[in-house]
Amino acid sequence: MLELIYILPLLCFVYFLFRRFVLENFYVESSGKYVMITGCDSGFGRLLATSLLDKHVNVFAACFTQQGMASLHSEWKLKKGPKGQLYTLQLDVTSQASVDSAKSFVTKILKEQNSKLWGLVNNAGIFSIHGPDDWCSVDEYASSLNVNTLGAVRMCHAFVPLIKKSRGRIVTMGSTAGRLHGLYVAPYVTAKFAVEAYMDCLRLEMRPFGVSVHILEPGCFKTELLNNDAQRMRIQKIWNSLSVETKEEYGEDYRNDFERAWEAGVNVVANPNIGWVVDCYSHALFSWWPRLRYCPGWDAIFMFIPLSIFPTALQDWILAGLYKLNPGPSLTPAVLVKNKKRRSAIQWIQFLSQIAIIPLLYTIFFVKNTQKQTVETSTHHHNVTVSE
């Protein structure tokens, strides 16, 4: 029995190594398969589309803008040699009509090619740093949920029937923010927790149909979503929408410090190697043994994912400490700075009062002692007179 306690963990570790370094390196035939990708204007989606095309995968690349469609198509045409077929389409995942139109387009092409849809990649998403929850209206939450969560739900509802026919794959962009909370990103964290919960439920329901569902949980990567100029504009826009009371509570210095702290943090943490995320996408789509969750990024592997299993109180303590280590300026609302100064002034007054009371106490003690000595002297003289 005692031997089993040592053997079972060892066997589990050996199986983990065997699966990770042997089984996961076997791939299904990807050439000629059809994959639908959302959010191909830039970043992960665009790089994934071009990467799959180089592997002879046929790609339905959904872009939010016509400019994104045109530039991607031009890039594809300039490539020489064997490549997959590119089909570009404009898609707004927040619009059911747009999603339905995309499904009709894809269904038509598949029927013409007598083929099936192998993969759906829910890559479209938005990220915007809004600031404290006091700055966020319900609209900020609704906007984040509508793209990051409901956008994926709409796409799954539309395309899952096509994926079932091929017993294919659904891969969705989550985030470490879907596992762990943080400061100043409540709308984004809320949406990512929600979309990961949806995918976890969908994964169980799709098992009988032979469809596998996978989630990517990357750390911080340098993409257009983290563009400093765009973030400055968002911060200024939301600041302008705040009430006078809220602006006075936080102060203009806080707004400026928040902007600088955000940029400093991103420059330190963000990983420029976005190919890491694209490789995870490809593995989830075509590996014989894909993982249910992928966590690209050193910050995800060594900090955020391990931290997500800690007790909540310890998570809060560590996260608060990490934010204090931010290379940017510290963030303290104006009202707390005033209160701190007021408390400091009161403490100084109390301290000075305590110092000032010492001479007073000494004086009282001296006077009382003098009076006592005077009384004792008078009594002594009185006693001497009586004796005579």
UniProtKB/Swiss-Prot annotation:
Highest rank taxon of the organism: Eukaryota
Listed pathway(s): Steroid hormone biosynthesis; dafachronic acid biosynthesis
Chemical reaction(s) catalysed: lathosterol + NAD(+) = 5alpha-cholest-7-en-3-one + NADH + H(+)
Gene that this polypeptide is encoded by: dhs-16
Natural source organism: Caenorhabditis elegans
Ranges annotated as spanning the membrane: 2-22, 300-320, 346-366
Taxonomic lineage of the native organism: Eukaryota, Metazoa, Ecdysozoa, Nematoda, Chromadorea
EC number from the UniProt entry: 1.1.1.-
Coiled coil: none
Function: 3beta-hydroxysteroid dehydrogenase that converts 3beta-hydroxysteroids to 3-ketosteroids, an essential step in the production of dafachronic acids from cholesterol. Catalyzes the dehydrogenation of lathosterol (5alpha-cholest-7-en-3beta-ol) to lathosterone (5alpha-cholest-7-en-3-one), a step required for maximal biosynthesis of Delta(7)-dafachronic acid. Dafachronic acids act as ligands and bind directly to the nuclear hormone receptor (NHR) daf-12, suppressing dauer formation and inducing reproductive growth, they can also regulate C.elegans lifespan.
Knockout or disruption consequences: Mutants appear normal at 20 degrees Celsius but have Daf-c phenotypes (formation of dauer larvae at low population density in the presence of abundant food) at 27 degrees Celsius.
Keyword terms: Cholesterol metabolism, Lipid metabolism, Membrane, Oxidoreductase, Steroid metabolism, Sterol metabolism, Transmembrane, Transmembrane helix
Protein name: 3beta-hydroxysteroid dehydrogenase dhs-16
